[in-house]
Amino acid sequence: VGDLIVKDAPGGVDIGRNVNSNEQLAACAVSVEGTYDPVTSLADLRHFDSLQVLSVNNRRGAPPITDLTGLEECKNLMLLSVPSVESSAFPTFAKLDSVVELKYGSDGIRADSNVSDLSALAQMKSLKMLWITGSEVDLTQLAGADLRVLRLDVTRIGSLEPLKQMENLSFLQLCQGPEIDSFAPLAESSVQYLSMSLSQGAQEAYKDMDYTPLTQMPQLIWLDLTNNITFDTETCKKLLANDTALKYLKISYTSAAKDAEELDTAHLKEFTAPAP
C-alpha cells in the first residue's frame, strides 16, 4: 500500500501519508493524522471489518489514546501503528489476533509513549514484527512473544536476558544507544541481523561496555556498529576470526575502522569502514 491519501479530514484539511507495508497487504488501509483534535478512541473502527492497515499519528504532546475497543472487530487487520496508549486500554492488544506488525509509540519521541506494561503485546497470536518507541522498557514483559523482528527506540532496556527466550528472533535493532546492562545475552540469542548504529552525538554511549559477546553469536549474518567509537581493533579481529555466518559488517567511524587494512575481511560480502 503506497502513496495513501486520506482526504476530507475535519476542518477541510487534506492529509497524505506513505504507508510502507508488505506487498501482500492489499487494498484496505486507513491513515489518521492531521492538525485537528487528537485521536483518543478507535471504537468506531469496529465498522471497518475489512481494514488491513491502520496508522494513527497524533501531535507531539497529545494525550494517550484511551480506548482501543473496536479494533478487535477488524479481523483482517495486519499492520497497526499507534502512538501512546493508556495502560487501561492495553488489554485490547491481546485480542488483536490477526496483527502481524505493530509499531507502538510516537516515532522518535520517546518521552511521549507509555511503556509501563507491555505484557499484552506478548499475547498477540500473529505478531511477528514489533517496533517500540518509549522510555524504559522491561523485556520480561514480552516473554512468550514469537517475534521475528524487534526494533527498540527507547531510553533504557536494562537486561537483554529475555531475548534468549525468543527462539525465532532474527532481526534486532537498538536505536541510538539505549542504556543496557550488558551485551552478554546476545551471545545466546538467535539474532542474525543486529543493528546498533549510533548518531554522532551518541558515539560514546557504550564506552564502558564489553563488545566481546558480539563475537560469540554463531548465527550472526549482518552487523552494523556505525559510530560505536569504542569498538576496537582487537575485538573486531576476534569477531572476524570466529567461525560465524557473518557476511555483512559496518564499522564506520569506530576505533577499529582506523585499522581496517589490518582486518581479514576476505570472507565478507560487504564491508564498510570509513575511519573517524
Predicted regions and their residues:
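Concave beta-strand-loop units of leucine-rich repeat
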Residues: 4-13, 27-41, 50-70, 76-90, ...
